[in-house]
């Protein structure tokens, strides 16, 4: 050990005194996350409250940590939870295993699963870190109805995915607007326009429920 070695160590300590601290006074002050931060998952809903999850289990197959468990079930005319033939009756995410990689989000064909800005997942109970469907479902927004209930946006599953996201919802259209339209149904024309815009990469996602947490609606 040389004579000047201790002074070199003091120099490193002295230089760090002028650097911006990287720690936060948590939980009094919380660090703002990036807009596309990979936090806790959320199961999204359609504008009428039906669930977007169709119980296909692709997210569970894509998970490299085997953290997702899904059980699908069939919808009936008396009990409908999603527009499709099936829905996710059981949905669990084990955050003791989850690595928050986002591969499940990419695998989801209906945009039912997204990731929020919520990162507060610490707990003193292993059981409480296995989130159930009720914990992951997005809260009901204005105009939504808790399932089960019939389809409100159309008569088939296709109406939910080809409709214009920027168009008013059926229960938002006034009698005056219907009269001005001459009573004609232009849903076919709107659907064709939506398909053309999505093909051109100009699609809108205004109908997605904003994720929980610090951020508002997440860019997609």
Swiss-Prot record:
Gene3D superfamilies assigned: 3.30.70.3270
Q: Which UniProt keywords apply?
A: 4Fe-4S, Cell membrane, Iron, Iron-sulfur, Membrane, Metal-binding, NAD, Quinone, Repeat, Translocase, Ubiquinone
- Give the originating organism: Frankia alni (strain DSM 45986 / CECT 9034 / ACN14a)
Q: Which residues bind [4Fe-4S] cluster 1?
A: 53, 56, 59, 108
What is the annotated quaternary arrangement, including any partners? NDH-1 is composed of 14 different subunits. Subunits NuoA, H, J, K, L, M, N constitute the membrane sector of the complex.
The cofactor note from the UniProt entry for this protein is:
Binds 2 [4Fe-4S] clusters per subunit.
Q: Which residue ranges are recorded for the region named Disordered? A: 164-220
Q: What is its EC number?
A: 7.1.1.-
Sequence ranges assigned to domain 4Fe-4S ferredoxin-type in this UniProt record: 43-73, 89-118
Q: Where does [4Fe-4S] cluster 2 bind?
A: 63, 98, 101, 104
Query: What's a GO biological-process term for it?
Result: aerobic respiration
State the function annotated in the UniProt record: NDH-1 shuttles electrons from NADH, via FMN and iron-sulfur (Fe-S) centers, to quinones in the respiratory chain. The immediate electron acceptor for the enzyme in this species is believed to be ubiquinone. Couples the redox reaction to proton translocation (for every two electrons transferred, four hydrogen ions are translocated across the cytoplasmic membrane), and thus conserves the redox energy in a proton gradient.
Enzyme class, spelled out = translocase
| Skewed-composition ranges (Basic and acidic residues) | 187-220
Q: Give the UniProt subcellular location, in the record's own words.
A: Cell membrane
Q: Which Pfam families match?
A: Fer4_7
Grouped into one coarse class, the protein's main location is membrane
Q: How does it sit in the membrane?
A: Peripheral membrane protein
Q: Please provide, in alphabetical order, the Gene Ontology terms of the cellular component aspect for this entry.
A: plasma membrane
Protein name, as recorded: NADH-quinone oxidoreductase subunit I
Can you tell which superkingdom this protein's organism belongs to?
A: Bacteria
**Cofactor(s) named in the record:** [4Fe-4S] cluster
Q: Which residues form a coiled coil?
A: none
- Tell me one GO molecular function of this protein: NADH:ubiquinone reductase (non-electrogenic) activity
């Amino acid at each position: 050990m040389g004579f000047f070695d201790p002074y070199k160590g003091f120099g490193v300590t002295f230089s760090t005194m002028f650097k911006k601290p990287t720690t936060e006074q948590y939980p009094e002050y919380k660090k703002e996350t990036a807009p596309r931060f990979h936090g806790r998952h959320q199961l999204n809903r359609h504008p009428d409250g039906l669930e977007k999850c169709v119980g296909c289990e692709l997210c569970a197959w894509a998970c490299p940590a085997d953290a997702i468990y899904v059980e699908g079930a069939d919808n009936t005319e008396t009990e409908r939870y999603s527009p499709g033939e099936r829905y996710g009756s059981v949905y669990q995410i084990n955050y003791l295993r989850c690595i928050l990689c986002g591969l499940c989000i990419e695998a989801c064909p209906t945009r039912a699963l997204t990731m929020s800005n919520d990162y507060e997942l610490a707990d003193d109970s292993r059981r409480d870190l296995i989130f159930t469907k009720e914990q992951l479902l997005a809260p009901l927004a204005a105009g939504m109805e808790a399932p089960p209930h019939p389809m409100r946006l159309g008569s088939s599953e296709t109406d939910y995915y080809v409709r214009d996201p920027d168009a008013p919802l059926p229960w938002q259209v006034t009698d005056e607007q219907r009269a001005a339209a001459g009573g004609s149904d232009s849903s076919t024309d709107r659907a064709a326009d939506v398909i053309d815009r999505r093909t051109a990469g100009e699609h809108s996602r205004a109908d997605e429920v904003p994720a929980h947490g610090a951020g508002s609606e997440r860019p997609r």
